[in-house]
Amino acid sequence: MVQGFKFSGIAAGLKKNGGKDLGLIYSETPAKVAGIFTRNQIKAAPVLLDMQRIASGTCQAVIVNSGNANCCTGAKGMQDAISMAHWTAAKLDIPEEQVLVASTGVIGEPLAVEKIQSAIPDLIRTLDAGGVSSLAEAIMTTYTVPKVVSREGQLGGTAFKVTGVAKGSGMIRPDMATMLCFVMTDIAAEPSLLKEMLLAAADRTLNRITVDGDTS
């Protein structure tokens, strides 16, 4: 795994089946960050929030839930996304603007944020450098196999590691759609270079996939 990152995934009661549904990625120091997002004109509250915050070029945590997408939820949905970041930042003792939010699941239903607030202390308590599998389980929706991969390589004579975690097996059409993908690395790169590499990789992979022909 990539050094400097910790992960966790727990059950907060958002899913009806009682499975893990709340995850956290935490960087021990502020990390350089880049991101790409759905091109759908209708964007969920967490997407809109992250598009604003990622412009700073740094991030230290990502809190993500499954079971509810917090999409088409209006002003209340945006406040809920902001609250998720606020509660996480307070418990981690980091700036609120350094926390990104992601949600996946049912569209158009209010998010049970009180359950998330209650679960955040346990979510942070269980952070572990080897906890990426728990994170992968926590972001699962309708499929049955957690998606985690790690690779090592050399760049200019310097060793590096990359770890990726993703969710999604349906409702995928080029340009991201409903899937989530988080990539962590110890490569020392500025946000502009990270964005360039991310776009190039996505164009050759994620943006060529169509499943169900649905971009919702």
Where are these regions (language model features)?
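N-terminal amphipathic/basic leader segments beginning at the initiator methionine
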Residues: 1-42
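A short, flexible beta-alpha/helix-coil linker loop
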Residues: 31, 68-71
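Glycine-rich oxoanion-binding loops at beta->alpha junctions
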Residues: 37-55, 141-155
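Glycine-rich anion/phosphate-binding loops
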Residues: 40-46, 74-83
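Short beta-strand/turn micro-motifs at beta-sheet edges
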Residues: 51-52, 169-172, 210-212
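Glycine- and acidic-rich phosphate- and metal-coordinating loops
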Residues: 60-67, 98-104
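Glycine-rich, mobile lid/loop segments that gate access to catalytic sites or pores
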Residues: 82, 87-206, 216
